[in-house]
Amino acid sequence: MSAAFVFQMYLMLVVFGLLFLPWALIGRRGAYLAVRSYAYWVRWSARWMVGLRSEIRGIIPEGEVLIAAKHQSFFDAILIVSAVPKPKFIMKNSLKYAPVLGWFGLRIGCICVERGKRTQAIKSMVAAVNSGNSPAGQLIIYPQGTRI
C-alpha cells in the first residue's frame, strides 16, 4: 500500500469529520452520512491510487441483524460501512478516544468493550445491546477480536 494513499486516507478522515460535523451534531443521520461518505471515498481512492478493487455481493441486510465478520484489515470495516444502511460496531474501548473516528463511531451507536477482559467484554456488550440505548441497525462484531 502506498504511503501517499495512507496519508490522504487519514487527511480525508479529518476533512470529512470537519465537513460533516454540523450535520452529525444535529442528528444521527448526519453521522451516518459522514461515515458512509468517507467509506465511499476510501474505496474510490484505493482503486484509483493503489489499484485495490472491491466488490460487495449478496443481499444486504437492512433490519436489525448481527453481522459476524473476519477482521483482516482496516478495509473490511470500510466495505461494511459502505454496504449496510445503519452499521454499528463492537469496538475496542481505546478507539473511542481516537480523534474523529471515535466520536463518529460513538455517534452512530458503536458499542465499546475492553478487549483484554473477555468475560467482562461479553457481559458489557450484551448489557449495552439489551439496554435499548443503542440505535437500531446492523451490529457488526469481529468474533476473533483484532485483525490478523
Functional labels for PLM-detected ranges:
Residues 1-55, 103-107:
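A transmembrane-helix-recognition feature enriched in membrane-embedded lipid enzymes
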Residues 48-148:
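Soluble catalytic domains of membrane acyltransferases
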